[in-house]
């Protein structure tokens, strides 16, 4: 049983040379977004130490962020404390998903500092073109909504996603 199909048409024939994506149509992601206060980079092992520090210092804040409820509140088991090596394995997994066109994860940076992440996945509910979640570290909590709004606009304008489902953020995505 695979992930749900991603119902988006792309103008590109292949994404990263792959034609066997689990998405219904091949996605060729646009250039990562860059704004006056942050830039996106494809989440990769190069971010390991900075990513680890960002979310490990912000577990409670992330659990309070829309889309990241802990298991006792109906969410999944991330984030929970883990080792730097376990985080590296997770980043390698996200990178493989990106290259295969299965899901798209980005590190959010301000200069060289990792201040959050963005995850773009097929929408398992079928209610939207994509399911999107984002978080910022606790020390940047005031930017949480700003990040989500800018990402949503980028997904609409550059990715051409007509509808985006943001769990816990009903004002976004339509």
Regions found by a protein language model. Name each.
Residues 2-140, 149-174:
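GNAT-family acyltransferases
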């Amino acid at each position: 049983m695979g992930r749900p199909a991603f119902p988006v048409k792309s103008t590109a024939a292949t994404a990263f040379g792959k034609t066997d994506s689990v998405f219904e149509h091949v996605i060729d992601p646009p250039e990562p977004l860059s704004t006056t206060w942050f830039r996106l980079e494809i989440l990769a092992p190069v971010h390991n130490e900075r990513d680890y520090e960002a979310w490990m210092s912000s577990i409670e804040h992330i659990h309070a962020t829309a889309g990241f409820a802990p298991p006792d509140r109906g969410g999944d088991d991330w984030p929970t404390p883990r080792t730097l090596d376990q985080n590296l394995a997770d980043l390698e997994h996200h990178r493989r998903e990106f290259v295969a066109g299965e899901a798209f994860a980005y590190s959010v940076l301000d200069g060289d500092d990792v201040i959050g992440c963005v995850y773009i996945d097929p929408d398992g509910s079928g209610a939207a073109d994509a399911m999107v979640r984002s978080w910022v570290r606790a020390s940047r909590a005031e930017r949480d909504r700003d990040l989500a709004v800018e990402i949503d606009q980028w997904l609409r304008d550059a990715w051409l996603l007509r509808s985006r489902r943001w769990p816990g953020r009903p004002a976004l995505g339509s």
